[in-house]
Amino acid sequence: MTEAAAQPAEKAKSPNAPTEETVLSVKHYTDRMFAFRITRPGAFRFRSGEFVMIGLEGPNGKPLLRAYSIASPSWDEELEFFSIKVQDGPLTSKLQLIQPGDKVLLGRKSVGTLVHDALTPGKRLYLFSTGTGIAPFASIIRDPDTYERFEQVILTHTCRQVGELKYGQDLVAALKDDPLVGEHAHRLTHYTTVTREPWHNQKRITTCMEDGQLYSDLGVPPLNPATDRVMVCGSLDMLTDIKALCEKAGLKEGSNADPGEFVIEKAFVG
């Protein structure tokens, strides 16, 4: 056996190798999006809003992994993920076929910038998302710490089609019955837009910001660095545009090492 051939086996023995977890449930929302829940190792810790590597065994036993935001809050005993389906994608073409009882691989360390530690204190928290980019915010809006830090939370979700909003709609509808944050559900506002189908709000979220519709609809003033904090996750175009709008409004980009008024997740686009 060559050294190269032995490499996958050596990785499997490494203390840093992914753990094997069991799929607990799977729900398909559209032909492009699905959510699933898996077991959570007792030693696995993360901050709400972070991402982790997950995947499946690939050819020759080598793990096929991709970064996924954790959609469940840090206190949850299970781990939830919200994924796009890519028919010819090396991982998602197979991951979309998983069923309860199947095994998936979970990385041992979570990271990310969409965390409260990367923001300075503020009054209002904006969570701007497109597509599956809502996943880290599904974690954040179910975290009690969010409502201890902010008086108001505004979650925006922009998708191509109306059906793709369903995950977020179900999430927000269930919030009032959440045992830990249900009493704060009235402080969360859910604002949706659709870009490729008829909808009462058929436009990009950045257009809603630029023409002032977002703020007039919500009854709040435009972005203000004195009161507003922003997190952004989704398409590359949206990340770029909202970053520019934040900077134009005077907000400073933050990080774990240097907290600011807005943060974006640069590790991947969803």
Model-identified regions with their sequence ranges:
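Conserved beta-strand elements of the Class I
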Residues: 125-128, 231
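Ser/Thr-glycine-rich phosphate-binding loops at phosphate-binding pockets of nucleotides
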Residues: 130-136
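A short, basic/flexible loop-to-alpha-helix module at the beginning of a structural domain
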Residues: 110-120
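Reductase modules of NAD(P)H-dependent flavoproteins
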Residues: 3-8, 13-19, 156-157, 161-270
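Short helix-loop-beta connector
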Residues: 119-124, 225-226
